[in-house]
């Protein structure tokens, strides 16, 4: 097995990573992940002491991991025994047979709803370690200044609140959302349609026209009434999200990481004003929300599969999820651990964070497709054109739908 792609924690290549074969104790494995997923030296030492398995870490930029895995696999080589698996890569990795299926108990599946995202044809391909799902946030003081005393329950409530915020001069562009030509813009349309109607795609993989058109029309209204900021159309999605921390936006549906961001005085100028709430729906609060988690999986080309699986089990255990929250700021994917951290006050001002975690479910009826990246590109480009006034909602839908249907026909 070639490890030429690795620059491990020790900064050295090794030919020993393939030793300690199947079913044996001890040995050495390699782990490739972004910086935020790398365990501490003490944590790795504890794992080695417990199992006899040494772990060589390769800290790789998130954007480069997928390419490194693909490059190695094309030469029938293993980039690393255990690898980062983003939710959006699952379909591609499954189609290419790059991941070894994992055995997961029903108890763990119940405790980690985001496992569904990494499950294809009843096979669990990776175990989620970092929880991200869509949660809503609103600035209670700004809402009150505009005469709004109730928390928004529906998307219509949010729209009317944003109109009031603008009309009263409280906030000029109160709705923060990604509209640039990037991935976050695609997922914004996905979660909006999903929380509105519980569906984004039909069973055959095509868009559910009624649901997606309703979401696009909602976005078009926000754009036309200038309830979103002009800069949201061209700046990064994260910059758009961060407007709520700067006080230039009053409402956001975004990452769970904002539970911490809205309390950090170095990042947020309106600390104490923003509350995490259940995401709105069509007739009341949404019955489901979209997960966007990160996971780790075992390479199908690994020569150390059993040792690698042992590492995955350890890394995603309840105890390690607590440790990784402390050392790496990872939001637990186990609801039992999330609840414990909230109850003991480790995670503060959590609002509806735990309640929302319990309604996480995947919007993909047949799992994430292998053509996800191409589909997402078609989506965010069409939405961005709509934001810039080049397309209306109907035209944006037609462009997206035509591209998706073409991808499906090529399958």
Where are these regions (language model features)?
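Conserved N-terminal structural module of periplasmic/extracytoplasmic solute-binding proteins
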Residues: 3-91, 104-109, 150, 281-286, ...
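Glycine-centered hinge/linker elements that transmit conformational signals in sensory
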Residues: 162-163, 204-233
